[in-house]
Amino acid sequence: MFSHVMVGAADIEKSKKFYDAVLGTLGVGPGVANGTRFFYMTKTGMFAITKPINGAAASSANGGTIGFAAPDIKTVDAFHAAGLAHGGMTCEDPPGVREGAAGKLYLAYLRDPAGNKICALHRMPKT
């Protein structure tokens, strides 16, 4: 459905260190530089961080979340720990299981150094 997702960051180098760490836990290589942007590419899509091209301050979306798929609970926990170790802040509830319309999920939420809300999500098997 999506070709890419891009978020703004005032301190692009700080954000790159954060995303290199958290996305590295998911098997994604370091961000590739292109001007004032860094791109993280996989076979299924692309994530990018950028300084806003209009020169205005970067801001995070109120109510917005970007979710990254994780293959297992251990990876979700590693994603969360890497984020905290690289300038992220925990938000929402601690990492753990949530149940709802989407089924049983193991989730961990963070705010990146620019304030963008992200999460790692593992869909748990139906029992």
Predicted segment positions?
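Acetyl-CoA-dependent GNAT
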Residues: K51-N54, V97, R123-K126
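Vicinal oxygen chelate
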Residues: A10-K14, F68-A114
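N-terminal beta-strand motif that seeds the catalytic metal site of vicinal oxygen chelate
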Residues: M1-K17, I66, M124-T127
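Long, continuous compositionally biased terminal/linker segments
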Residues: M41-A85
